[in-house]
Amino acid sequence: MTVPQERIEIRNIDPGTNPTRFARGWHCIGLAKDFRDGKPHQVKVFGTDLVVFADTAGKLHVLDAFCRHMGGNLARGEIKGDTIACPFHDWRWNGQGRCEAVPYARRTPKLGRTKAWTTMERNGVLFVWHCPQGSEPTPELAIPEIEGYEDGQWSDWTWTTIHVEGSHCREIVDNVVDMAHFFYVHFQMPEYFKNVFDGHIAGQHMRSYGRDDIKTGVQMDLPEAQTISDAFYYGPSFMLDTIYTVSEGTTIESKLINCHYPVTNNSFVLQFGTIVKKIEGMSEEQAAEMATMFTDGLEEQFAQDIEIWKHKSRIENPLLTEEDGPVYQLRRWYNQFYVDLEDVTPDMTQRFEFEVDTSRALESWHKEVEENLAGTAE
């Protein structure tokens, strides 16, 4: 047996543990129009169950799903007027969480209240506010409006929903600073990559091309396209990305939503969608086709991410190079949503900017692509 004279210190992975609480902030639970079909909808989120329904004016409401009478599931009930009726005993609950009627009883219990969740509808999607302390959202936390969305300047949303098991939401948020994974996982060539953190907002600015040796998604349809992406997380779970796709002298502007909400502390629902801004000469059908093409490409990319998450370890102490970006700063920023408001510290919210020097990475990547192309040509 050979015993080394000097023991080399081995770096071990600290997997840590997932937070037991759910993030404070606005969480998108889906397209608003999907909840306006005259039926109640059950949403599993934040370790509980909610029911979403529309009243006669079309306003969406979100309540705890289980009736305070005998625990019936309101999502299995029926919308009656401006109330949701329990399928068990027909108790009627309005959008503010008050019991309005018990049809078989002489009186309605004065203490008949259930939890009504704070909601916001913006850009055609529905948000629910969550805070473990019970605080209400302040105006500066509102999701920004997309200019021209209400005026018909954009296509309709294309939308995809995927349930991710065995991973915490932080896995997808880590992608905000992960420049290198765009090359290895998504087959893109990032030429410029910068992060900006400020308050509750985290930004990612990227300029990229597709790889010449591997064509997937949008690259199949627009092989020479340059992608200019300015993406911002508004809080812990909702990203709005403005993307300019430049190809053959034409610039196409699109908006990407990349959002998620936690189901448990080890599973979440990932949702994403695209709208395309209509340009002169572009028909409604062409704009819709373009949005579908972009969303199909996103679905392929997220499938690549999910395959990584399914088989990786959670890691609290990643070993990094300068080109890996500000991972630890991102996580400090992200932690502000998992502590009480009074425990948010300046290093979680102060402005922080970091631009990755991509020169060494590009040198290596261009060489790898050239070698792959040469091997294919043989």
Curated annotation (Swiss-Prot):
Activity at various pH: Optimum pH is 7.
Source species, domain of life: Bacteria
Catalytic activity annotation: androsta-1,4-diene-3,17-dione + 2 reduced [2Fe-2S]-[ferredoxin] + O2 + 2 H(+) = 9alpha-hydroxyandrosta-1,4-diene-3,17-dione + 2 oxidized [2Fe-2S]-[ferredoxin] + H2O
Chain positions recorded as [2Fe-2S] cluster binding sites: C67, H69, C86, H89
Activity regulation behaviour: KSH activity is completely inhibited by zinc ions. KshA is specifically inhibited by Fe(3+), Co(2+), Zn(2+) and Ni(2+) ions.
A Pfam family assignment: KshA_C
UniProt-listed InterPro entries: Cholesterol_7-desaturase, KshA-like_C, Rieske_2Fe-2S, Rieske_2Fe-2S_sf
Record key words, sorted: 2Fe-2S, Iron, Iron-sulfur, Lipid degradation, Lipid metabolism, Metal-binding, Oxidoreductase, Steroid metabolism
Protein's GO biological process: cholesterol metabolic process; lipid catabolic process
Domain Rieske: 26-128
Induction conditions: By cholic acid.
Disulfide bond keyword on record: no
Cofactor binding, per record: Binds 1 [2Fe-2S] cluster per subunit.
Residues reported in the UniProt entry to bind Fe cation: N175, H181, H186, D305
KW Lipid metabolism (keyword) present: yes
Temperature section of the record: Optimum temperature is 33 degrees Celsius.
GO molecular function terms attached to this record: 2 iron, 2 sulfur cluster binding; 3-ketosteroid 9-alpha-monooxygenase activity; iron ion binding
Cofactor(s) in the UniProt record: [2Fe-2S] cluster; Fe cation
Name of the protein described by the UniProt record: 3-ketosteroid-9-alpha-monooxygenase, oxygenase component
